[in-house]
Amino acid sequence: MSARSIHIVDTTLRDGSHAVSHQFTAEQIAAIAGGLDAAGVEYIEVSHGDGLAGSSYNYGWAALGDEEMLKAASAAIKKGKLTVLLLPGIGTVEDLKMAADCGAKVVRVATHVTEADIGEQHIGMAKKLGMMAVGFLMMCHMAPPEKVVEQAKLFESYGADYINIADSAGAMLPEDVKARVGAVVEAVKVPVGFHAHNNLTMATANALAAVEAGATFLDGACRGLGAGAGNAQTEALVGVLDKLGYRTGVDFYKVMDVAEDIVEPIMHRPQVVRNAPLMLGYAGVYSSFLLHTYRAAEKFNLDPRDILVELGRRRMVGGQEDMIVDVAYQLAQKRGGN
């Protein structure tokens, strides 16, 4: 039995934003952030689902601006570290400066698994601002372990404090996770983390596989609230890790109460593995495409599964949300011509 410490990064107020169409209110943000902080969660991520400056026609308009969200969370967090996500090309260094001014202590710079180089400027700026900087590699199922290692080493060379391996499509199985996380752990000198999605119901199993491979940071969300079928449930992760003898510093009862009393009442729908999220994982499609796909399917009277299969076949990646409507239109035209 190990006594190793595992750092919990809760993404309810960032990845969970996808599941509520980015409509968190300031009061909800303060309540969730304050509850997580009181429960001992070390890192509390708050942003639009697509990161700083994500509120847009393409990614979905948020109820609040970034500054309002961050100020609401910062006022409620007393011990934990306010964390933000930034996708280069969406968020800029100016957005990062604003986040730091609002109290953010950590930025996770997220790029496609083959594009770590576009995050160099943002990692560098974060370090200049005195922030903890994380290299966050998305859609890691799309690259073999050696490519993931190559990109992780780039992030390390830019000054990243740890590397996060993300199964953004919820497409990986435990052996896939072990292969990628284990290879990165062996190759870099900084810690390694893992971000799971539950599209194939493997989120907690994959998180544990990551820990077995040497990861020391794990992402979770209360009630699993997140894109697609959601993330690993923070409260479940804490309980499972405790049973296995790992230290998280999180009060199990308190984090369960946050999930049940604060998060669950504001969920738009149960975070379960329905057909379309299951297809996300099966086809290897970016989890935040889900609600966009539902809307396109309704508009063109299509089965969302058909759209997702085609998106997977075309190897669409995060940032190509605008292509969902194009694909749906093409499928509808093809159907009409048959």
From Swiss-Prot:
Metal-binding is among the record's keywords: yes
Site residues by UniProt (Transition state stabilizer): 14
InterPro entries recorded: 2-IPM_HCS-like, 4OH_2_O-val_aldolase, Aldolase_TIM, DmpG_comm, DRE_TIM_HOA, PYR_CT
Catalytic reactions of this protein: (S)-4-hydroxy-2-oxopentanoate = acetaldehyde + pyruvate
Pfam assignment, any one: DmpG_comm
Enzyme nomenclature, EC number: 4.1.3.39
A GO biological-process term: catabolic process
Record: active site: 18
Residues annotated as binding substrate: 14-15, 168, 195, 286
Enzyme class: lyase
Superkingdom of origin organism: Bacteria
Keywords: Aromatic hydrocarbons catabolism, Lyase, Manganese, Metal-binding
Protein name: 4-hydroxy-2-oxovalerate aldolase
Species assigned in the record: Moorella thermoacetica (strain ATCC 39073 / JCM 9320)
